[in-house]
Amino acid sequence: MIKIIVFDIYGTLFDINSLREDCEKVYPGNGEKIAKAWKYKLIENIHVRQLVDQYKPFSSVLCDALEYVLDRKDFDYTVKDIQTCVKGYEQLEIFPEVQHVLKEWNDIDKVIFSNANKQMIDALLKQAAIDTYFKDIIPLEGYGMYKANGNSYKILIEQLNVKKDEVLFISTNKWDIVSAQKFGFQTAWINRHLSEFEYLEVQPNYEFQSLYGLKEVLKKT
């Protein structure tokens, strides 16, 4: 039985592609290109750091990834330029169905689980007016590790005092779903871009194009 819903935040509740607008302010005509490269470099950096056990706070890796992209593409930048782009992580666009779905699921506990720090998460949730829908926020920056480290999911169940199979873990990121599924959570992959789930050994329990699809799942709990 599902007792709690755990949400990833970036790409799941908020559109990470909206960063192109913040990058566009600083680099007119190049915002989309920079934002896309930044996103992939950030994911790569986090995964490599996890593999070699060299933790660095998410907020710092965020800046490192952006600076790398700008250097590689020969863009000049100042500290203010970096801050303007990074500030976009606190102002991302919320996906259109999120507020309605969270309100409808008001009778089940919901938690945010993210690599970011609490300040970044709080600011993002408040600007979208959805901060009151969550029972708790578990920011991994305070624990010195990233998803998809198996120990991060142990922290989650210890904090929430639930069993693995009582958690419904929701993410749009495939690597996040694979790790959570292998740990023992029930998982729902939000396939917003209609892509293939190529990890044949591990499959999510549920797959939907948006959060609306989870309505039928929760009816059964």
Labelled PLM ranges:
Residues 1-5, 118, 122-221:
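Asp-based, Mg2+/Mn2+-dependent phosphohydrolase catalytic module
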Residues 29, 71, 105-109, 185:
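Short glycine/proline-enriched coil/turn segments at helix->beta-strand junctions
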Residues 29-37, 73-83, 132, 164:
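Short, surface-exposed acidic
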Residues 23-27, 101-107, 218:
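Alpha-helix C-terminal capping segments
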Residues 80-91, 98-127, 137-140:
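Substrate-recognition element of Asp-dependent hydrolases with the DxDx(T/V) motif
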Residues 1-43:
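Active-site neighborhood of HAD-like aspartate-dependent phosphohydrolases
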Residues 46-83:
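A metal-dependent, Asp-based hydrolase signature
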Residues 20, 35, 39, 59-67, ...:
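An amphipathic alpha-helix signature
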